[in-house]
């Protein structure tokens, strides 16, 4: 299995180095739910600005403040502890009056707003995230500048970031041990992390192999294509290749890669044969996903950062802003720009 740092680059390996997250303020994330609170209901949506706190810790503290069980506080996604992040938490408080959340005190946290809402905020129920990153000690400004220009046009590989696999790859290692021993895993969190790591690693492998062998944006017979921003897909046929290629070039359609699991993968003929060959050696992980009834799905192979802009503070420091849809990784953008020092794995999704 290819490690994250060794996955194939779309724009070639960066020529320069730099520092990501020299300070928490160098990594700012603003969550975009894509909807506004209802203004009524048994839940309260709370928008929190935090620095130096992980999401679960803040959620538990909020539950304690509201005198409710920790499971009654939910969130759409984990945000990094070592960053400045803005996100929504959701507390279920049926039959209770609206509390004064301005009295909620936690070091490194600030309540920005809160309102009633009708529904629980579930994991993954967000539109995306806006990022403001500062790269410091950049050793090759010209290379980074050109890469930013190229990314505006060609995007980046839509890899799952190293944080998906845990510190030191612990989640993927757990999945491999589970696959090899067939011992039941009772812990729901471990099950979720390990299965997610297994499927994500196989997806990354398929995309990396496609980048090695051919133009990742070249439609082949049997490819599974999806409308940009949509989840459903259809299969390309030989007769349609020219027209489908035009639509891919226009970014109207996206070529997808498999998220392996049980059931059909979604591709056919040439594309299916390629995907199967790309992960043929990973029989244990594939068998684990089938055994645990994780359904196969699809994910776009390329990611196009939206609203991408940048500003050089000086020759070695650049501020970069962009927006990514839910499930995408800022670190997959950064790895196409510079060779960073430090470990990506501690950066939450």
From Swiss-Prot:
The keyword tRNA processing applies. The keyword Transcription regulation does not apply. GO terms for molecular function: RNA binding; tRNA pseudouridine(13) synthase activity. It comes from the Bacteria. Residues 155-303 form the TRUD domain. Gene3D superfamilies: TruD, catalytic domain, TruD, insertion domain. It catalyses: uridine(13) in tRNA = pseudouridine(13) in tRNA. Substrate binds at residues 27, 129, 329. Keywords: Isomerase, tRNA processing. GO terms for biological process: tRNA pseudouridine synthesis. The active site is at 80 (nucleophile). It is an enzyme of class 5 (isomerase). Pfam families: TruD (PF01142). GO terms for cellular component: cytosol. Transmembrane segments: none annotated. Responsible for synthesis of pseudouridine from uracil-13 in transfer RNAs. Belongs to the pseudouridine synthase TruD family. This is tRNA pseudouridine synthase D. The lineage of its organism: Bacteria, Pseudomonadati, Pseudomonadota, Gammaproteobacteria, Enterobacterales.
């Amino acid at each position: 299995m290819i490690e994250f740092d060794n996955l194939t680059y779309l724009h070639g390996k960066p020529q320069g180095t730099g520092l990501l997250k020299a300070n928490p303020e160098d990594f700012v994330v603003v969550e975009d739910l894509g909807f506004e609170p209802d203004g009524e209901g048994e839940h309260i949506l709370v928008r929190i600005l935090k620095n130096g706190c992980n999401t679960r810790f803040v959620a538990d503290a909020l539950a304690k403040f509201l005198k409710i069980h920790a499971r009654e506080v939910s969130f759409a996604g984990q945000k990094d502890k070592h960053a400045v992040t803005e996100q929504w938490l959701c507390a279920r408080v049926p039959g209770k009056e609206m509390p004064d959340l301005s009295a909620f005190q936690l070091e490194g946290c600030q309540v920005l707003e809160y309102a009633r809402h009708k529904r629980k905020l579930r994991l993954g129920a967000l539109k995306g995230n806006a990022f403001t990153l500062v790269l410091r000690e950049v050793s090759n400004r010209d290379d980074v500048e050109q890469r930013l220009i190229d990314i505006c046009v060609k995007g980046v590989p839509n890899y799952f970031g190293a944080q998906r696999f845990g510190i030191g790859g612990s989640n993927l290692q757990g999945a491999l041990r589970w696959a090899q021993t067939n011992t039941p895993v009772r812990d729901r969190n471990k099950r979720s992390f390990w299965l997610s790591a297994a499927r994500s690693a196989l997806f990354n492998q398929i995309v990396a192999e496609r980048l090695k062998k051919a133009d990742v944006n070249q439609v082949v017979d049997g490819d599974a294509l999806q409308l940009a921003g949509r989840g459903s897909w259809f299969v390309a046929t030989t007769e349609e290749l020219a027209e489908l290629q035009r639509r891919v070039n226009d970014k109207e359609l996206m070529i997808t890669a498999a998220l392996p699991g049980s059931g059909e993968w979604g591709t056919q003929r040439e594309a299916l044969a390629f995907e199967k060959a790309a992960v043929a050696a990973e029989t244990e992980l594939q068998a684990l996903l089938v055994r645990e009834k994780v359904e196969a799905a699809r994910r776009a192979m390329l990611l196009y950062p939206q609203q991408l802009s940048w500003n050089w503070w000086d020759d070695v420091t650049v501020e970069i802003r962009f927006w990514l849809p839910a499930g995408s990784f800022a670190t997959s953008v950064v790895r196409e720009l510079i060779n960073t020092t430090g470990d990506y794995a501690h950066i939450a999704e």
